[in-house]
Amino acid sequence: MADFLLSSVSKTYKPGLFKKPVQAVNDLSLNVSHGTVYGLVGPNGAGKSTTIRLLLGLIRPDSGSILFSGKLLKESTVQSEIGYLPENPYLYDHLTLAELLNFCGQTSALSISDTHERGQVLMAKLNLLEVQKRPLRTFSKGMLQRAGICFALLHDPSVVILDEPMSGLDPIGRKMVFDLIVELKQQGKTIFFCSHILNDVERLCDQIGLMNNGRLIKQFEREVFLQNIGKTVFLHTSILDESQQLNIQSLGGSIRREGEGHLLAIPDGNYYPVNSYLEESAIKILGCRSEWMSLEDLFIQSVKESGQ
């Protein structure tokens, strides 16, 4: 079952009478399965934050539909079931952390005892117990980030949306947040997050979406993703016609124009069928090399192929 199902969603911002409209999301379709960790990555301006606002119901799509747990988003009680950490959380800095969490508990209709117990557990996990009586204005960027995560999780939501959760964190803070996300996953919660730290996405996610220019250009289940990283063979070939390009892509290779020919990127497991096709088609190979491809490499390659 999908917690979120987006079908052909588009959103355009119209900044003013004399300014050009900006299409932030363009024909976006994605499926966030229940109990999974979904990582959405893309360059600045790709449409990730707009996608999150659409998921939260903070803005309405111009076209398309968004379902939450099988219901249209506008008909669901999404706010009570989601915990949200924005990229730059604004917290009432005159409050202490304990006061902030008490306020969150009241707005979430939690009892005083549940608020206290839940707050103590979260602060302990994120190493904030000793500073809970300090005003938030005295917190560092990393401490505020961890405080924002406590705020987002206090009401024990079934779905957690995190926009750049590792932002401003030192290595120890990143480890604490990483472990907490793993724990939430083990509890069966659905987690959707955007991050520029691709190593964390690579290690955490069951599903990964690559976004550029408002479009979802690639989407992987973890098993498929693992088949696309690791050792990759790069073949520089002569010019390929459209039919040859389609055949190579169907065999698991990706293609881009380079120099006087094309550059093929082929995951190690797909090398032999692609190479056999090249031989059968008498396609000239001009050069060959192999590299270890990470998610970062795959991301950069996909953005280039999508036309950025």
Feature locations, PLM:
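Walker A (P-loop) phosphate-binding loop of ABC-type ATPase nucleotide-binding domains
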Residues: P43-G47
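Conserved ABC ATPase "signature" region
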Residues: N102, Q106, S113-V131
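ABC transporter nucleotide-binding domain
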Residues: F178-A265
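Short, charged/small-residue-rich alpha-helical element at the C-terminal edge
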Residues: K231-E305
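A short, flexible loop at the N-terminus of ABC-type nucleotide-binding domains that lies
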Residues: M1-L6, T12-D27
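Catalytic Walker B motif of ABC-type/P-loop ATPase nucleotide-binding domains
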Residues: V160-E164
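Conserved ABC transporter NBD signature motif
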Residues: G64-S80
